[in-house]
Amino acid sequence: MSPQTETKASVGFKAGVKEYKLTYYTPEYETKDTDILAAFRVTPQLGVPPEEAGAAVAAESSTGTWTTVWTDGLTSLDRYKGRCYHIEPVAGETDQYIVYVAYPLDLFEEGSVTNMFTSIVGNVFGFKALRALRLEDLRIPPAYIKTFQGPPHGIQVERDKLNKYGRPLLGCTIKPKLGLSAKNYGRAVYECLRGGLDFTKDDENVNSQPFMRWRDRFLFCAEALYKAQSETGEIKGHYLNATAGTCEEMMKRAVFARELGVPIVMHDYLTGGFTANTSLAHYCRDNGLLLHIHRAMHAVIDRQKNHGIHFRVLAKALRMSGGDHIHSGTVVGKLEGERDITLGFVDLLRDDFIEKDRSRGIYFSQDWVSLPGVLPVASGGIHVWHMPALTEIFGDDSVLQFGGGTLGHPWGNAPGAVANRVALEACVQARNEGRDLASQGNEIIREASKWSPELAAACEVWKEIKFDSFKAMDTL
C-alpha cells in the first residue's frame, strides 16, 4: 500500500492513510511471557512487500484499521497493538512467508476461545492485500491458559472412571450413520459393546431426525450399554451426541443423558461453536460426564496448505474450550493425516509441555501448566490390519475407533468387536514383550488369528484394503 499525503486536521491529528509497517512492523520487539504469539503463512499480492503484509496482519487482527482515526489519541496503541516481530521465507515456495505476530494479553477476554479467534482469525483473512493467509500455530501463555477450565476431566480421571489401564481404548461408530430406527440402533450398540469394545458412538450428523428422535436413541442406547455391562463386567459407554440447533436444546439433551446415568456425551465443536462447546464442557465437569468431541467441518478450515487454520491450532483451542476426546486422524486410514504433523498435534493434546519442533510443525514451545489432557481418537477407514501401526503410532493414551471395521465383519457386529479386541490385546502384549510392532505387525495379527476365528475372518475380508495410494495435502 503506497502512503498517501497526510493532512493536518484542525482537531490536532494527522489524518490520512499510512503504511502499516510504519506502526506494526517492529523487528526489534522482544516478546513477553504474557504475549499470545502467532505464526502465519502469508502469501502477499504481487507488489506487496512482506514487511507490509506482515504488519497488515498484525494491524487488522488487533487495533488497526485502514486509515488514521482521531480516537487513536484516546488510548495507548503501543500497549494494545499487535506487532509483526519476525518474518522468514518459506523454503521451496516463492512469495510465501512465515510471519510472527505478538499480541498483548489485554486484547482478549478471559476464558473465551470465541473472542480469541474473533480477533486473530477474523476479518484479516479477507484482506485484499493478501492472496492467502494461514494460521500455522499459536503460543498460548500460561497466564491466559489459567483462565480456562479446559477438558472436563482429562486422561487420568477418565481411566479411573472406566477402570481401564495399559492399553488404548476401543470404539465403534454405528453405521449406517443415518436411517436406522432407535431400537435397531440400540441393538447394534449392544452387540458391539458385548463383543469387547469400550465405546460406541453416534456419528457427527446424528442429532434428532424424523427416523430417530434423540430421546428415543438415548433411551435405547442406555439400555444397551447397561445390558452389555452386566454381561461383560466392564464399564461401557456410548457417545450420545448432544449437538443441537440451540444451546438450550443441547443442554437439555446433556441433562437427560446425566439422568440416564451414562458416562459420556458428545459434541460437534466446530459446527456447534466454541461458546456452546465451552458451556457443555463446564456442565460435564460439574456433573461427572465425559465429553467426546467430533471435528466435523475441520477440513474446510485446515486442509489447504496456504489458507485457513492448521488443525494444531484447532486442537489447542479445543483443549482450552474443553473436551476429553477429539478426533485426530489416523495416519494410516482413509482420512488426511501425515505422520509427523499428526503426532505433533497429538502431543499438544496430551502432554503438559511440548518443545518447539519445526520438523513436526510445532512453531512454539507450549506449557499447558497442568491443564488436563485430551485423548486423541483415531477413526476413519481403519481395520484389524491397521491395529499394530495404530498401537505403535498413538500409544496407550488414545481411542482407536473402528466403524466399518467392526460392523463390516462378515459374521456380524459382535464378532467384529471380538476381532478388534483380540487384535488390540495381541498388539499390546507383543509390544510389552519387546516386539517391534512396525516391522512385525502383520505377523503378530496372523499369530493371534490362529486362536480367534473372528479375527481370522476379519483378516480375510480386509487383507487387500489400503488407503496409502493418496498423498497427504498438508505437508511441512
UniProtKB/Swiss-Prot annotation:
The disulfide bond which can form in the large chain dimeric partners within the hexadecamer appears to be associated with oxidative stress and protein turnover. This is Ribulose bisphosphate carboxylase large chain. It comes from Liriodendron tulipifera. InterPro entries: RuBisCO (IPR033966), RuBisCo_large_chain_AS (IPR020878), RuBisCO_lsu_C (IPR000685), RuBisCO_lsu_C_sf (IPR036376), RuBisCO_lsu_fd_N (IPR017443), RuBisCO_lsu_N_sf (IPR036422), RuBisCO_lsuI (IPR020888). The keyword Aminoacyl-tRNA synthetase does not apply. Belongs to the RuBisCO large chain family. Type I subfamily. Gene3D superfamilies: Ribulose bisphosphate carboxylase, large subunit, C-terminal domain, RuBisCO large subunit, N-terminal domain. One of its GO terms (cellular component) is chloroplast. The gene is rbcL. Heterohexadecamer of 8 large chains and 8 small chains; disulfide-linked. The disulfide link is formed within the large subunit homodimers. Its cofactor is Mg(2+). The modification N6-carboxylysine is found at K201. The modification N6,N6,N6-trimethyllysine is found at K14.
